[in-house]
Amino acid sequence: MSPTRVLVLNSGSSSVKYQLLDMRDSSRLAVGLVERIGEGTSRLKHTPLTTGVSRELTSPVADHAAALKTVAEELAKDGLGLDSPELAAIGHRVVHGGRSFTEPTVIDDDVLAEIERLIPVAPLHNPANLTGIRTAMALRPDLPQVAVFDTAFHTTMPESAARYAIDVKTADEHRVRRYGFHGTSHAYVSRATAKLLGRAPKDVNLIVLHLGNGASASAVRGGRCVDTSMGLTPLEGLVMGTRSGDMDPAVIFHLMRVGGMSTDEVDTLLNTKSGLIGLCGDNDMREIRRRVDEGDEQAALAFDIYIHRLKKYIGAYYAVLGRVDAVAFTAGVGENAAPVRAAAIAGLEELGLVVDSERNAVRSDEPRIVSPEDARVAVAVVPTDEELEIAQQTYALVGTAHHLT
């Protein structure tokens, strides 16, 4: 029998998230996380889904090689070791593929070199992704390793959406353009939303709102992305937990010239001290809503700014698409924060967008419609599953996949 298991790895700068899936039925066999790698006391949480009983280890994990060795040992205890003949491939999340990678790719030396060449446009993410890949390749050099790129789904954008209005020669020389991120999530949710509507992806136009601590919007026409809110980096677009999103670029020059801030200080400000946390000191939407309900004016203003930006993108992408069949909310805030969904859609009745308050209040892990039955445009809540998407794309490349259609 052909191997049917795929290990999905998401390697961050000081963490490794992983899931082991059986692609015969897309079931999860184990999930886990190693965090605080290289920080003295590291923590591993491993859950075999056969028992559902988690194991936690706290011990020094010096680097990603040691982390993956620990993961392999924990999987082996459950009979799910990396040396199993049932393991078909390892799928890696890679944040930035630039224009070079438009689809999942089996990793070889040339692919590694190109991911490394893209580090200047993804200095926080690609180095960690590369470390995870190289470590996994050393553990199982005989096994296919597949890179699934966050940017790939957005490579279908027309040049009119992807190009910035700056000097073409300068832009090309320094690879300055809109790449977009969260593409794995947008791809999964766009197909899942079409399924929820009972239609083929090629027949629907969607606005997908991935609202987590990081947040992005995309306009999807017939299954292909035609615009997205994040740009050269994940800083552009919506107001996020700690990122500013859109603003006048001259703010940067002002802060450097008048405020005396360095490049690194401005970078840190806009990426980690802005957005909701900069506006009200909190980046947890649950806490912000609690404060709003208690009459906190600063939290209320932060919420209003967040919603204002979100509405602007919904309206803009409605104009880009011309016809919209559904607006889909996903990720931590999008899936769980009913007040965010209600506020974002409020006042858009002329566009055919309405939220049913009772449906919107229901909490569920299942995809669902929260607009009235007779609404012209569906408003949907569709839980994302980036790990399953990576596993499906990986398995499609190395075996026979069972796609979400």
Swiss-Prot record:
The active site is at residue 150. One of its GO terms (molecular function) is ATP binding. ATP binds at residues 17, 210-214, 284-286, 332-336. Substrate binds at residue 93. Pfam families: Acetate_kinase (PF00871). Mg(2+) binds at residues 10, 386. Its cofactor is Mg(2+); Mn(2+). Its main location: cytoplasm. Its EC number is 2.7.2.1. Mg(2+). Can also accept Mn(2+). It is found in: Cytoplasm. The keyword Transmembrane does not apply. One of its GO terms (biological process) is acetyl-CoA biosynthetic process. It catalyses: acetate + ATP = acetyl phosphate + ADP. The record marks 182, 243 as: Transition state stabilizer. Catalyzes the formation of acetyl phosphate from acetate and ATP. Can also catalyze the reverse reaction. Belongs to the acetokinase family. PANTHER family: ACETATE KINASE, ACETATE KINASE-RELATED. HAMAP family: Acetate_kinase. Homodimer. This is Acetate kinase. It comes from Streptomyces avermitilis (strain ATCC 31267 / DSM 46492 / JCM 5070 / NBRC 14893 / NCIMB 12804 / NRRL 8165 / MA-4680).
